[in-house]
Amino acid sequence: MTAYSGSPSKPGNNNSYLNRYVENLGTNVTPPLRPQSSSKINSSLNIASPSHLKTKTSASNSSATILSKKVESSVSKLKPSLPNKLVGKYTVDLSNYSKIELRYYEFLCRVSEVKIWIEAVIEEALPSEIELCVGDSLRNGVFLAKLTQRINPDLTTVIFPAGDKLQFKHTQNINAFFGLVEHVGVPDSFRFELQDLYNKKNIPQVFETLHILISMINKKWPGKTPALTNVSGQISFTKEEIAACKKAWPRIRDFKSLGTNINTAPASPEEPKEKRSGLIKDFNKFERPNIPVEEILITPRKNITDANCSDFSNTPSPYNEAPKMSNLDVVVEKRKFTPIEPSLLGPTPSLEYSPIKNKSLSYYSPTISKYLTYDTEFYTRRSRAREEDLNYYQTFKYSPSHYSPMRRERMTEEQFLEKVVQLQNICRGVNTRFNLYIQKRLLNLFEQDILRFQACLRGNKFRVLSSMYLPIRRAKIDVPHVEAIQSRIKGSRIRYKYDKLKFTLSRFSCTVELLQAYCRSKLLKTTVNTKLNDIEISHYPLTKLQSYMRASYVRKKVMSLNTKLNDERESIMKFSAIIRGNVVRCSEDAILSAVHDVHKENISKLQSLIRGIFTRSCLASIIYSLGKENCNIIQLSACIRGNAVRHKVQSLFAPENNLSETVHDLQGLVRGILVRYTLDLVDDIVEYNNLALFQAFSRGALVRESLDQKSSFYKRNVRSVIMIQSWIRKSLQRSAYLELLDCPNPSLWAVKKFVHLLNGTATIEEVQNQLESCQASLDSENMKKERLLKSIRQQLNINGVLDKFGLLKDKDHELGISDSTIPKSKYQKYEKLFYMLQVDPSYWKLLYLKEPEFVAKNVYMTFGTVNQRMNDRERSYFTRFVCEMLQNAINEAPSIESFLDNRSQFWQTILQDFLRRESPEFFSIIVPVLDYLSDPVVDFESDPYKIYQEIHGFSSPQHCSPVDDASTKNKFIDNLRCLWHAIEMVAEIYTRKVHTIPVEIRYLCTKIFCYAADKNIEEIDSLRAISSILVNVFVSEYLVNREYYGYKDSNVQKNNQKIDILMKSLATVFEIKNFDGFLDPLNQYANEIKPHIKDVLYNVLVDPEYEQEGDRLIYLDMVSPSPKLELLTEKVLEISGKFEEYLNEFPEADILHDILEKNLDNSSFPRSGRVTLELDASAYRFLVSDDKMRKIYDQVKRAFVYMMQIEDVDTNLYDLSISTILPQDEPNFANFLEQNPKIRDDPMIQKLKPLKYFTLKNVTLKKIHELESTGTFCSSDNKLQNFLNDIANTIKNPNYAIDYVTQEIYITKETLTKISEMNHSLDIELSRLKKHVDHTIKDFQKAKDFSPVHKSKFGNFKNAVKKVQGRERSELQGMKFKWNTKQLYERGVLKTIRGEKLAELTVKVFGSSGPKFPDIIFKISTSDGSRFGIQMIDKRKGPDKRYSDDVDSFSFKDLIKTQVEPKIETWKLFHSNVVVNNSQLLHLIVSFFYKRNAL
């Protein structure tokens, strides 16, 4: 980093290239500000009335005029106000600052200069310099927008005010300032980016841009703005302020200079000034001085002399120290340049690079570039203005197009090459001169170092030559003790130096002690205050938390009891009822039994008396009631007797009525007999006279006559008939061809016309088998890689265990393996699980069917880190998950109409969340529509009654229609126009900016189109499915949730009503439906736009290459560094636990069972915070079932190809599959096979036994049923239209499927090769690590002596006696140590002994005697350090002795392996009677056998 050498405005920092660049800026560097165009969608008929706009414009012009007058007076009369920190001219002592502090001081001076200038222009006070550099006062861009509006109000009309917090809309203010920078012509290298200011990435770059902008304005438009004031040395800053600036911006550099003189005297105030709306009205008119012809720059040639002929007299005598030079002695010679041709300084500057990508300086060949000559910068700027300008749709005028005169002529290849060569020469010259200038600046910075280096070189050269030409003869002098004398001299010097330092320090000993005491006291006070503050802060919350916890504990206890009682409530109630019933019954039974025994006869008599009394009272009441109705009863009996008499009288006339019915029946029978007899008689007469034969002859004659007439007519017009037939066939073939190409769901009739083209084409089975073989090999290689990585990590962990116990003498630095080759894999099973959750969306889909709320809450975080955007890889995988949920929603919907009507589906919610998090920048596309809706003049109300009431203030009369009112009618028409204009604005987004739509949205549109086509054969339903994403998801997200993106409405409720109406209208238009109700007049426009809407919906679809790239991601993950996923610890455990809970729902052969077969180890997880998972791609397995379904699907498709050529069915494939086989179908199938011998080689045809059409159809139906059972499709819903669509696509591109599989085979082989190479290198590394670990263990085992201690003669005599007496035990060989049970237990080695109570406390009369241990001795020995023997000796006697002497063994390497993954905590020895702790046992072995010298 270079240091500041003063103000960039000083003359000493000239940059000739940038100076000439500013002076030579052409008049057409940027297009002049012009009123923006009014396109078709911005027509005044569709937006607002002219009177309103005219009033608004005049008001802005008047305010601009007043502002310009105020600015002119301030510029001509006032000088810029200086800051309060100014202490006079060059009165600040800069010697107190260090070198680094001086750089930040100069930087703050530049900030102060910019602050003074802006305050003078906008006449408003700005915050302090430190606040501007470190704070957030500039981030909202309000001051920059005010500066832009002050200089030229046309550049910004609206300034978004500063609020309580930073919002997205504040970027409009910064973009307005970028317009000022663009029109002034600041070079790209001096401009800052939006994120430098908005995200506070590089604030120093912002001030550098401002400094350059001010310099260029003062240079090009002198007198328009105040001059820039140099405050270096005149303003003071405290060291705390400089430290704060340094902390905020650790790296700063000096400002680049344009070489302009900022102190240029302003123009005379007496000059007449034009009336303008700002300080600078036209940026194309500025003062341009004449370019002086400079002298030719002569590069000084370096005087290279020969080393052998050099003159030593020129070398200074003192060679050990370079002479000091002052910076003032360095003469800086002004560079001289050759005159520049005037043609190169024409209207277009040679080095003016537009920030917009331009094709005018294309690297295409001349033959291609000549077709791009009309793509001028004007159209590029115009398109950029349409995309970025938020007020573009509020304008109403177009300005005439300006074409460059040079662009009107088409250049030849020679002219183009000449211009390119000329431009390249100019660029190379400028770059060379700029590099020379930079090198000179670097040399100036390192002048002292270079001078010292040159002096050292000259001295070294002189010494070398002196030794060559002037050899010094030295006599050999042997002085004894020279080294001792030299060391004594050096020692005395060092002691003298240290004594001097001690004496110097002793002078300030009191001060040092006081300083130390003060520091210690300060530290102690700080610590005590911190603890007191912590106690004071946490006391109240802690007591409150404790009370909450106690209350929560009590409530939980009460609730648990209440819950248990509620669970048994019914049983308790039944039990209590039974008890009460038993008590009552017992008391009653006791009373009855007592009474019954004493008064049995009296009770029976009493009962008979009561019954008699009750019966008599009932009879008396009945008799009494009948006595009151005695007269009525007499009358009723008289009526009954009269009715009986009348029935007897009527029965006398019954025979006559029966006779009449019998007569009628007899007459009917007679007439029937006569009619039948007549018909039989007529039939006999007809048969006798051959009437049927006569009729047949007559009909035959008529038919023959008609056929003769037709035959003669055909013979006379045979050519015409053939032509008509050919025309008909041609027309049918053409219509079938167009339907096949254009229609997404062609009919069976159209496909049958061209299905014969697929006869003899190659099948996919062979390449599919090859792909399965490659994928199986890839799976095996992945498993091998997983095993190798596991083994390598185990060896590395063993090496770490050895290092932990200090058994490594020389650490091998070659053991380290880069993270890209071997991931750390701290959480291996979690990394596999979350990789599968990303790659395979079926897991989330199955869990969503069980736990939809859980999936909605947690699925998004498994694809990306919190508060960070997804990468392309994660976006692709997440899009696949949305597709899976989308397909599931379509399959579960009863019909495509019900699916489209449901606006609250899960896939829509997660897609809107994806747009909100990952694509907020696309909100700028919808901003013009929102600005149009926010206009108070725009209204979408279509109800004439409401319009009438809104205009007149009262309801319309009942006797007349509100449309009869002229004002209501005009308002109704204007509202419909406004609504249709908003619809056109949205349609224009999908027409002109279709490529700006996220590719994920377009891919989902493609997939939903295919899913809808498979669900329903109607084309219109597929297009409506596309519109459900474009309108109900994409547009709806940005319109409805506009506040999230920082857009503020003046009337939120009114705009919500407009958006609701607009969304319904957009759905009607894009779903190609008709308006109803009051919006019916819009149908004429909707019908005209329907073909255009269809084209728009089709243009949104993406090519299959995008999906193929997504399929290749899995292979890329296998050979790339492991992708990382950062999640909260609790979320990782929660998600993995949920999948463990539903593990049985997944297929048994699924890889998820292998991952979750054991409980996931979460002991290494941090208790809180985040966990970074390195996802393991080797966990993925290619499913054989999917490949099998693909084969079956292809076989069914080929079977339908053959069946369409056999049977004559034109409805759909479902009818073809279930149709009855006719007798002629079998011969037709045999002839079909004879005519197409290649079809006989089809493996599917060869497997037919017998080879008949019936067998083919039967096998095909079974395969269709198998596909339906797997959920691939539903034949009853779409009538097998998906097969027909696939056949039609195969006719269009017959080799697509085979090419796709072939390409996948190629990628699989490449991946297999790379993984094999990785496995080979891992295998080599594993063997190296194993050898290293074995060699290390053997080395430190050989370095130790494990021979036993020499025994005495008595010991040998004892062994001999034991052998003779037969009391010999198995003795351990080599070095041995023994411990009792207590020692091993206290060391943590011994865990348990079966049947023994270790460390049991026994209480005696006088108190406890401490823990007791069994008298068992353990001896451990080894003879080579590799294998250890352990002996257990039970010293107890009598019944207390439980174990006989036993011996067990273990290897040291096995003991080390227990300390690495998977760790084994304990071992069971001596027939599982003794349990030991492996970690403590290893520590014991190392301490006593390998490090016994350290004990």
UniProtKB/Swiss-Prot annotation:
Domain of life of the source: Eukaryota
Modified residues (Phosphothreonine): T264, T299
Domain Calponin-homology (CH): 108-221
Cited SMART domains: CH
Coiled coil: 759-798
Modified residues (Phosphoserine): S268
BP terms from Gene Ontology: mitotic actomyosin contractile ring assembly; mitotic actomyosin contractile ring assembly actin filament organization; mitotic cytokinesis; protein localization to cell division site; regulation of actomyosin contractile ring contraction; regulation of cell wall organization or biogenesis; regulation of cytokinesis; regulation of mitotic actomyosin contractile ring contraction
GO molecular function, one term: myosin light chain binding
Location of the Ras-GAP domain: 876-1100
Protein name: Ras GTPase-activating-like protein IQG1
